[in-house]
């Protein structure tokens, strides 16, 4: 297991993302990096962070936009092979800017319309009513143990 010491400082030298040390780093790209969200109510929930300070999509360069799309497609393929979600929600809210201090980011949230189990745990799935709602209104906020997140990370990285 690789240590995460100073990892976020290396990726974003401004230090703004140091509070995200509990996020499980997945992969670094030129402009972005992927991290597993510590809240795994929906199995495979991930974050895509911009390395530089920008708070709105209109500020992105063409290179950043193209890479964001490419990374999403790579992640989508990996998450499909790993867990086969029925749908993906994407969200870019920016409501907690005090946490990331202006690093634009997206939430990638796999949704499942069937019971989903992994590594001996049950994860959140949708029923007919909840599948119509945004993930923010139905997800269960719970930090999952590091060993579970590590197994999820390993499964995604097999395909990423």
Label the model's feature ranges.
Residues 30, 42-45, 84-86, 102-104:
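A generic structural signal for short beta-strands and their flanking turns/coil linkers
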Residues 3-16, 110-160:
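C-terminal helix-cap and adjacent tail motif
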Residues 69-82:
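Active-site helix/loop of acyl-thioester processing domains in fatty-acid/polyketide metabolism
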Residues 47-70, 133-145:
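Short histidine-centered catalytic/ligand-binding loop motif
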Residues 83-98:
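A short glycine-rich, hydrophobically flanked beta-strand micro-motif that places a catalytic Asp/Glu
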Residues 1-54, 150-160:
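Active-site microenvironments that recognize anionic phosphate/pyrophosphate groups
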Residues 80-87, 107-109:
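Short, internal acidic amphipathic alpha-helical interface segments
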Residues 50, 95-118:
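Histidine-centered divalent-metal-coordination microenvironment in nucleic-acid enzymes
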């Amino acid at each position: 297991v690789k240590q995460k010491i100073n990892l976020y400082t290396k990726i974003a030298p401004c230090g703004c993302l140091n509070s995200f040390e509990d996020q499980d780093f997945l992969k670094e790209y030129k402009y972005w990096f992927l991290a597993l969200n510590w809240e795994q109510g929906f199995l495979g929930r991930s974050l895509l962070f911009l390395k530089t300070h920008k708070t709105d999509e209109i500020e992105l360069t063409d290179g950043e936009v193209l890479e964001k799309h490419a990374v999403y497609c790579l992640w989508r393929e990996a998450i499909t092979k790993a867990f086969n979600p029925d749908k993906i929600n994407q969200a870019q809210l920016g409501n907690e800017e005090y946490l990331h201090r202006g690093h634009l980011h997206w939430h990638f949230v796999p949704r499942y319309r069937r019971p989903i189990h992994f590594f001996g745990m049950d994860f959140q799935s949708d029923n007919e009513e909840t599948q119509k709602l945004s993930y923010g209104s139905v997800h269960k906020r719970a930090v999952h143990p590091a060993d579970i997140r590590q197994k999820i990370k390993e499964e995604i990285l097999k395909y990423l």
